[in-house]
């Protein structure tokens, strides 16, 4: 079994694309394939010591799911399936996609929701990311002046995505016992 579980929720496929770009940097022994949370059981998800989790922020700051007009189930439906699990001793890194121009008041709020969910259940969340280079008004994904994970805006800053992903993976690798 791979050491790191890589899971995402997606509506348009952008988060899936980023997850697949992350997976390409690791072999199968190190990281699982990128798997949509609507295709994983709670048991399979919970078996990983290390998790990299991705989410877009939809509408006015919502997690993807049926109530936010997604065509398929996503984080909104998956989180209740794992809410009773204890994530103590697990290390989680988050990446989020959002639109800082179209939704500056709640940029990456869904990533903030995932952060709260996993920290409340004992997980150690790593991979805080600087807010420098972003222009937004508010975000629940900012704690102590930094994003709680990798912040991506494919709508307005797509040219910075590859560089940001590479820098973030280098930052979190030691937390997962890896070197890049």
UniProtKB/Swiss-Prot annotation:
Cofactor(s) in the UniProt record: FMN
| Domain annotation Flavodoxin-like: ranges | 4-173
Sorted alphabetically, the Gene Ontology BP terms of this entry are:
nitrogen fixation
Q: Which UniProt keywords apply?
A: Electron transport, Flavoprotein, FMN, Nitrogen fixation, Transport
Q: Which SUPFAM superfamilies match?
A: Flavoproteins
Q: Mention one GO molecular function.
A: oxidoreductase activity, acting on NAD(P)H, quinone or similar compound as acceptor
Would you say which domain of life the source belongs to?
A: Bacteria
**What is this protein's function per UniProt?**
Low-potential electron donor to a number of redox enzymes. NifF is the electron donor to nitrogenase.
Q: To which protein family does this belong?
A: Belongs to the flavodoxin family.
Name recorded for this polypeptide: Flavodoxin B
Naturally occurring in which organism (per UniProt): Azotobacter chroococcum mcd 1
Q: What is the lineage of its organism?
A: Bacteria, Pseudomonadati, Pseudomonadota, Gammaproteobacteria, Pseudomonadales
The gene designation is nifF
């Amino acid at each position: 079994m791979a050491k790191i579980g890589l899971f995402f929720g997606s509506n348009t496929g952008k988060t899936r694309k980023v997850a697949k770009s992350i997976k390409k940097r690791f072999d199968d022994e190190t990281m699982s394939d990128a798997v949509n949370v609507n295709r994983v059981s709670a048991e399979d998800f919970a078996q990983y010591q290390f998790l990299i989790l991705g989410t877009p922020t939809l509408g006015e700051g919502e997690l993807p799911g049926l109530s936010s007009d997604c065509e398929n189930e996503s984080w909104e439906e998956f989180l209740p399936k794992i809410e009773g699990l204890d994530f103590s001793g697990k290390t989680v890194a988050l990446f989020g996609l959002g639109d800082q121009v179209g939704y500056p008041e709640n940029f990456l709020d869904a990533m903030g929701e995932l952060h709260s969910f996993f920290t409340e259940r004992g997980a150690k969340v790593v991979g805080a990311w600087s807010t420098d280079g972003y222009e937004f008004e508010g975000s629940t994904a900012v704690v102590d002046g930094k994003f709680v994970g990798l912040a991506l805006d494919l709508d307005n800053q797509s040219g910075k995505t590859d560089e940001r992903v590479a820098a973030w993976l280098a930052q979190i690798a030691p937390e997962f016992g890896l070197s890049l």
